[in-house]
Amino acid sequence: MSVALASEYQLVQNAQLPQRWSQSARKSLAILEATARKEATAQMEAAGGSFCGQFPVDPAFKVLSLEYSAPNPDIARAIRRVDSVPNPPLPSHVVAIQSTAVDADLSLAMGVSLTPGRHTSYLVDARALQQSNSAAVAARKADGDKWGPACDEMFRGCRCVTGQEVVFYTAVKEPAGEVEGGEGSLFKPSFDGPAFRPSWGELSGKATGVVACVLQVPIGKETDIICAEYDNLVSKGQFATVDRFGGDHTVNMTGNALIQNDGKAISKGYAVAHRARVTSNVYGKANDVSLQRLAETVWSVVEKRLSFMPAYRDLVITEQGKPFMLGATATNIISLTENQGVMLHLDTDDGVWTIILWFHRHSGIIAGGEFVLPSLGISFQPLDFTIVVFAANTIVHGTRPLQTTGKIIRWGSSHFLRFKDVNALAQLGAAYGVDELDAKQRDQLEEVDAANSKDGVGAARRVASCMAAERKAAIEAQKAACVRGVVMNPCTGRMPSLLFWQVWRKPPALAVRANAVAGKKRAAADVDFCGA
């Protein structure tokens, strides 16, 4: 078992996207990007800023508060910047990719399709990223369970990218394997020396992977479906509530989590996600369809822009795990918060890619509430419909506390893979039958509740304890039979930190020919990530 599992995991670790790069595709995309950048620059100059949503966002300013207006009952739109300060620069380990040719190469190779002329691509020094990640973990420990001076200091140094579409890449010498170390130490060192100006020559033989991507989704049919399904699930009591970080953070949870009627979840704190489904007054096929439709619509919005997501799903989710996903996604849990901040943290028990989205209801002003990725040196205020897709098990992240004026509500929702639950559910499904599992778990909850009503808490606990022992035995038996829902590292019991590496063996031939013709200045602009 261990040899087979290790081999399977190694294949996942070394996974690469199908090659989409070609000279003609690269040239066409580079020309499109160059033209779109000129048009976007002209529009930005005319508007006094980058026009995203309902108002121009000036990149010279860090947005601290925004006003939202709700002309219709669906989504409130951000209409103006209320408060701001000068925007700090990016940290030295994060550099913008100025060359449209290099941007095209990375987009094609990594499966990233952002709006031409409306996005910025960055390359992040892996060694400094690891160090910054560790510093963010230390700041969190210094402040405890509430935002304090250490975390605020990190936020003040972050550059605001509100209203922008951005993608971050990093590079490592060896795509397989993980660094031993403390929290956040998941990257291998890559570039040496104080000057970080990576070029194609320096990337040759190294592996590049996507770390994070921020998307600005236009309001339309898909966002209408998403918001309608959230409304349906909230209004019918589909979500249950759990407190985190000492009760300072309240989260509404739903999805496919392992039943724990003894109160101890396989994924600590997420028993409520399953309880919400099996105790809901509208539990059943219709409600499950609503939950599936929500997850699949969000997934479709993302995979149109990040084509590596379906490949990620197909690699890590086994046949035994598929029945416990929310539709054709790699999501089994959905959380929802209302006007909430959350401390900086890592989600080490989650799958590789987490999707977080925001939308707003009613009118008013929000001060604070920025989403912060300190190791990437960025923060942003969510606008009309902002989505971030990132390696939440690798990159420290959090949301600053916020204050509101008026009736404005900022809904923030996370779609993620809690892989311990998927494994446990797959093993229980193999033991009892996938189709019978929901009914069995619902019956167990009812039996515990009946024991409590008839004979008191002590009797209920004894019944629950027997059920927990039965489940544990079934899980262990199926684990021994090699049943698993997700491919994980057999040594650490966790998922890989990053997936889909593109190893650059040589500079693209087209770039080499263009450089030879254009001269040194043109060569520097076309080959060097940082420009001339």
UniProtKB/Swiss-Prot annotation:
EC class name: oxidoreductase
Record has Secreted as a keyword: no
Cofactor annotation remark: Binds 1 Fe(2+) ion per subunit.
Key words, A-Z: Dioxygenase, Iron, Metal-binding, Nucleus, Oxidoreductase
Residues annotated for L-ascorbate binding in this entry: S335, L336, T337, H397, G398, T399
A GO-annotated cellular component: nucleus
Enzyme Commission number(s) from the entry: 1.14.99.-
Disruption phenotype: Decreased 5-glyceryl-methylcytosines (5gmC) DNA modification in the genome. Reduced fitness of cells during exposure to high light levels. Defects may be caused by hypermethylation and down-regulation of LHCSR3, a protein-coding gene required for the protection of C.reinhardtii cells from photo-oxidative damage under high light conditions, causing a reduced capacity for photoprotective non-photochemical quenching.
Molecular-function GO terms, alphabetical: dioxygenase activity; iron ion binding; methylcytosine to 5-glyceryl-methylcytosine dioxygenase activity
Catalytic activity: a 5-methyl-2'-deoxycytidine in DNA + L-ascorbate + O2 = a (8S,9S)-5-glyceryl-2'-deoxycytidine in DNA + glyoxylate + CO2; a 5-methyl-2'-deoxycytidine in DNA + L-ascorbate + O2 = a (8S,9R)-5-glyceryl-2'-deoxycytidine in DNA + glyoxylate + CO2
Outcome of swapping D347A: Abolished dioxygenase activity
Superkingdom of this protein's organism: Eukaryota
Chain residues that bind Fe cation: H345, D347, H397
Intracellular or extracellular location(s): Nucleus
Cofactor(s) named in the record: Fe(2+)
BP term (GO), one: regulation of photosynthesis
Main location: nucleus
Family membership noted in the UniProt record: Belongs to the TET family.
Task performed by this protein: Dioxygenase that catalyzes DNA modification by mediating the conversion of the modified genomic base 5-methylcytosine (5mC) into 5-glyceryl-methylcytosine (5gmC). Catalyzes the conjugation of a glyceryl moiety from L-ascorbate (vitamin C) to the methyl group of 5mC through a carbon-carbon bond. 5gmC DNA modification may be required during photosynthesis as an epigenetic mark that couteracts DNA methylation.
Protein name (record): 5-methylcytosine-modifying enzyme 1
Organism, as annotated: Chlamydomonas reinhardtii
Gene name as annotated: CMD1
